[in-house]
Amino acid sequence: MMRIAIAGGTGLGYLLASQLSEAAYAYQVVVLSRSQHPEYAGLDVQVTVVDYNDEENLSFALQGINLVICTFSGNEQLNLINSAAQNGVQFFVPSEFEGSIDKRPDNDQLYPDSYSTEARQLLRRWTRLSQMKWTVFSCGVFMERFLPGGLGSMFIGYRSNLAMAGSYLLDTSSYTAECVEKNARGHTVRVCLTSVYDVAQFVVAAIVLGPASWPRELTMRGDRLSVRDVVGQCSRALNGNPIKPLTMYPKLTHQPPFSFPSGRLQTLIDLLLRPTSRVIIQSIYSTVSSK
């Protein structure tokens, strides 16, 4: 019987554990968490409290584990990768539930504390030095980011500053949006979106097929929309309250009081303008509509 460790007991981790416990094939599921979770009492799941900064504690928790699925990023994931490789884990799924890996920048300037690049580099190193294989599940943006409560309503993203409503593109609770509509070449910016529930189902289905057959990356998407369409659909869902466009220049000199910090938005604009030195006016949505 395959022993699967899911690192992270809430949000996506809980969805994965609950669906694996109900899968047609039998798996021994162990949830690694920083604290106890009584909500697992009704599931055929073992909860193990771990300290991700304690090498000996992690090593003990990973004994006999075949597959590790991590649902959080940062330095603690790096510790988990090291311990998994050193303790004979065969397969590792990092917390890289976002865009396709071949289209990501080498360093995430918007979320530098995620250590995403470092995690992939470490996994490549352990692939050479051990028998551990790894696979990324690329799903684009979680649709639940656009809930009124953001990803936090799903207990996702609290440790990586992604939980709050409005942490990406738009905030449906305040009827505001900030997004670059076209890139430096004038092409429409589009995003792939997938519900976190569908991501969990996809991962479980892949486990049923067998990790031994997994490639380096498995991709999925629930939809692919331009950022204008994302804003438009959210506007229609908000009882018809519109989010109207406001054109802003690449260099910000001020910001509306309801917007995100200008430094963060400027970073996003600079990243999109990086391939060229041309000055292009980007269409940014940043408005407040009356309810």
Please describe what each predicted stretch is.
Residues M2-Q28, L32-S35, Y40, D102-G240:
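Oxidoreductase cofactor-interface core, primarily capturing Rossmann-like NAD(P)-dependent enzymes
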Residues V31-N87, P94, G99-N107:
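NAD(P)H-binding glycine-rich loop region in Rossmannoid oxidoreductase-like domains
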Residues G88-V89, L162:
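Active-site loop of short-chain dehydrogenase/reductase
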Residues E217-L218, V227-S290:
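Terminal hydrophobic/aromatic helix or amphipathic segment near a protein terminus
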